[in-house]
Curated annotation (Swiss-Prot):
It catalyses: Hydrolyzes single-stranded DNA or mismatched double-stranded DNA and polynucleotides, releasing free uracil. It comes from the Viruses. This is Uracil-DNA glycosylase. Keywords: DNA damage, DNA repair, Host nucleus, Hydrolase. PROSITE patterns: U_DNA_GLYCOSYLASE (PS00130). It is found in: Host nucleus. Residues 35-80 have a biased composition (Low complexity). It comes from Suid herpesvirus 1 (strain Indiana-Funkhauser / Becker).
């Protein structure tokens, strides 16, 4: 075997003596040299990516570590962002003077995008037209009847559109305002069942509301002089959702659904509630409302289910 080149020959080795390198050492030296030569080429390319850690070193999907890593890198865009325009309950309740007892039924709806658009459109209408009832009366029904006190639900369509009439209760008008024809027919039906009740001197139904009668229109506002003008705003969707939650939380309610509109707008489960239907109390209805037996039927059901009947007087 040849010895090392003269430049590499160990100092002091006599001439003619050959240096023998063990095979194992030579192999190790050659491998190290090859690795050293390859390293600069790989590092200098600039296009190679660092090696991905083995699977055992990576956090499994769905674990807290994986979630934290995803959040840190901003890669998870699947979670919907909260609606920045949704009103808080406190702001909504303050704007409309909503009773806190209705929070559990109303708050889930006002947080939805459609409700934000509805309220924005309502506020815009208030800037350009006379809207009835007054803002503080739109949710007056919440202040007069708490959910836990509801016995009877009467569904109307939209508020009266004449000046001074609407005040937040379906079919009701303020004291001192002439009794509308529809309400006169309602009073006639009550007296047909309870002839000893005194004839009402006014059309304000707040006494009914305080006794557990929820008087709720499907559309809560209207432009003065233009019936049905605010139906496109979307109040009906909110009202339906609130009534549905009421049906789910309060058993054995009595529903009085007068006319096709009310019967389509509200569909309580007849196995869980007493559902009464009749024509609308308008004088234009085909069937005279004065013959409607609902007021007596409602009280009979309330007594049958262990509750006090409703006093249908208005004073």
């Amino acid at each position: 075997m040849e010895g090392p080149p003269p430049s590499k020959r160990p100092c002091g080795l006599p001439p003619g003596v050959r240096l023998v390198v063990p095979a194992a050492a030579a192999s190790a030296s050659n491998a190290a040299t090859a690795a050293a030569a390859a390293a600069p080429a790989g590092a200098g390319a600039g296009a190679s990516k660092p090696a991905r850690p083995p699977a055992a070193a990576r956090p499994a999907k769905g674990t807290p570590a994986a979630s934290a890593a995803t959040t840190a890198t901003g890669a998870d865009a699947s979670a919907p962002a909260p609606d920045p325009g949704a009103p808080t309950w406190d702001a909504f309740a303050a704007e409309f003077d909503v009773a806190p007892s209705w929070r559990a039924l109303l708050e889930p709806e006002i947080a939805k995008p459609y409700a934000r658009l509805l309220l924005a459109e309502y506020r815009g209408r208030c800037l350009t037209e006379e809207v009835l009832p007054a803002r503080e009366d739109v949710f007056a029904w919440t202040r007069l009847t708490a959910p836990e006190d509801v016995k009877v639900v009467i569904i109307g369509q939209d508020p009266y559109h004449g000046p001074g009439q609407a005040h937040g209760l379906a079919f009701s008008v303020r004291r001192g305002v002439p009794i509308p024809p529809s309400l006169a027919n309602i009073f006639a039906a009550v007296r047909a069942t309870y002839p000893t009740l005194p004839a009402p001197a006014h059309g304000c139904l707040e006494a009914w509301a305080r006794r557990g009668v929820l008087l709720l229109n499907t559309t809560l506002t209207v432009r003065r002089g233009v019936p049905g003008s605010h139906a496109p705003l979307g109040w009906a969707r909110l009202v339906r959702a609130v009534v549905q939650r009421l049906c789910e939380t309060r058993p054995k309610l009595v529903f009085m659904l007068w006319g096709a509109h009310a019967q389509k707008a509200c569909a309580p489960d007849p196995r869980r509630h007493k559902v009464l239907t009749f024509s609308h109390p308008s004088p234009l209805a085909r069937t005279p409302f004065r013959t409607c037996p609902h007021f007596g039927e409602a009280n009979a059901y309330l007594v049958q289910t262990g509750r006090a009947p409703v006093d249908w007087s208005v004073d």
